[in-house]
C-alpha cells in the first residue's frame, strides 16, 4: 500500500461538525478513486452528535427526540463528541474487496493503541469494534435437565458470523460480566474505496450513550481509556500513538486480492 497521508481536521475548540466531515470524506473518496490523492486518514473530534447506520431500528434512537444524523455506513447508532478520537481512513482496496479484512486491520490498530497505554483489549466474536472484556462470572451449579439452545448467539440479530476466528474472544453468553466497548467501528466501501472508520473513546462523557442502545447491543457497556486507567488522558497524548499504529498496520497490509474459486463446468 502507498504511504498513508494524515489530515488533522480539527480538535477541541476546532472540533468539526459531522456534516462538514462527511462532505470532506466524500470529496477525498472521489479524489482517491481517481488517484488524485494518496490513501488518506482524516483525524478529528466532533461536537456532540448521534449518527445512525443503515440498520438502526426506531427503538434504538434517543427516547427524548435528540436529533440523529442518518449516514451511509454499516452498523447502527452511536454517539460522537468531545474526548473521542475519530478516524476516517480512505483507502483504495484491491478487488474483490474484502470488507471484513479491512475492519480487522482497523481493530488491530486500536488494540495496539490501547495496549501501548496499558489497556488490554480484544475483538469479540460476532461483534465489530474493540472491547475490554468483562471479568469471568463464577461457575453456576447446573440445574439439571436438557437444554436445546445449543448456540444462543445465532439468534442474536447483532451476531455477525463473519467476525470469528482465533483472534476473537468468544461471544459473551453469560460467561463474563458485561463487556465494555472502547472503540466503535462502522465502515463503507464504494467503488473499491473505504469510508467512515473508528471512534476511540479517550476521555468522553459516556453518559451521552445512556440515551441510546449503542451499536444496537443491549448486553454490553461503554468505556474509555481514561476510565480504564483511572487518570486523565488527552487526545493530544493518543494522536501520535494512533498515527504510528495506523501507519504500521495499514501501510504494511498485504492487500492482495482474495483467491476466488472458479466455478466448475
Swiss-Prot record:
Pathway: Protein modification; protein lipoylation via endogenous pathway; protein N(6)-(lipoyl)lysine from octanoyl-[acyl-carrier-protein]: step 1/2. It comes from the Bacteria. Belongs to the LipB family. It is found in: Cytoplasm. The gene is lipB. GO terms for cellular component: cytoplasm. It catalyses: octanoyl-[ACP] + L-lysyl-[protein] = N(6)-octanoyl-L-lysyl-[protein] + holo-[ACP] + H(+). It holds the Pfam family LplA-B_cat. In the reaction, the free carboxyl group of octanoic acid is attached via an amide linkage to the epsilon-amino group of a specific lysine residue of lipoyl domains of lipoate-dependent enzymes. InterPro entries: aa-tRNA-synth_II/BPL/LPL, BPL_LPL_catalytic, Octanoyltransferase, Octanoyltransferase_CS. It comes from Streptomyces avermitilis (strain ATCC 31267 / DSM 46492 / JCM 5070 / NBRC 14893 / NCIMB 12804 / NRRL 8165 / MA-4680). The record marks 181 as: Lowers pKa of active site Cys. This is Octanoyltransferase. Keywords: Acyltransferase, Cytoplasm, Transferase. PROSITE patterns: BPL_LPL_CATALYTIC, LIPB. Its EC number is 2.3.1.181.
Amino acid at each position: 500500500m502507498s504511504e498513508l497521508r494524515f489530515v488533522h481536521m480539527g480538535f477541541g475548540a476546532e472540533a468539526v461538525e459531522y456534516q462538514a466531515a462527511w462532505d470532506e470524506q466524500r470529496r477525498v473518496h472521489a479524489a482517491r478513486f481517481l488517484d488524485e490523492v494518496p490513501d488518506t486518514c482524516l483525524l478529528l473530534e466532533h461536537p456532540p452528535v448521534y449518527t445512525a447506520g443503515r440498520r438502526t431500528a426506531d427503538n434504538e434512537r434517543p427516547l427524548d427526540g435528540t436529533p440523529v444524523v442518518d449516514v451511509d455506513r454499516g452498523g447502527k447508532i452511536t454517539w460522537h463528541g468531545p474526548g473521542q478520537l475519530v478516524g476516517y481512513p480512505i483507502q483504495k482496496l484491491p478487488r474483490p474487496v474484502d470488507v471484513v479484512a479491512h475492519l480487522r486491520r482497523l481493530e488491530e490498530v486500536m488494540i495496539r493503541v490501547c495496549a501501548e497505554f496499558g489497556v488490554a483489549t480484544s475483538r469479540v466474536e460476532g461483534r465489530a469494534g474493540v472491547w475490554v472484556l468483562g471479568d469471568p462470572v463464577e461457575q453456576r451449579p447446573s440445574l439439571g435437565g436438557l437444554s436445546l439452545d445449543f448456540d444462543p448467539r445465532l439468534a442474536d440479530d447483532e451476531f455477525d458470523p463473519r467476525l470469528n476466528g482465533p483472534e476473537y474472544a468468544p461471544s459473551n453468553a453469560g460467561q463474563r460480566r458485561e463487556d465494555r466497548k472502547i472503540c466503535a467501528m462502522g465502515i463503507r466501501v464504494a467503488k473499491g474505496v473505504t469510508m467512515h472508520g473508528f471512534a476511540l473513546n479517550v476521555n468522553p462523557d459516556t453518559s451521552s450513550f445512556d440515551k441510546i442502545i449503542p451499536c444496537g447491543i443491549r448486553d454490553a457497556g461503554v468505556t474509555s481509556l481514561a476510565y480504564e486507567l483511572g487518570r486523565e488522558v488527552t487526545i493530544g497524548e493518543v494522536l501520535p500513538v494512533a498515527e504510528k499504529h495506523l501507519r504500521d498496520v495499514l501501510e504494511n497490509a498485504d492487500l492482495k486480492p482474495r483467491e476466488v474459486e472458479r466455478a466448475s463446468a
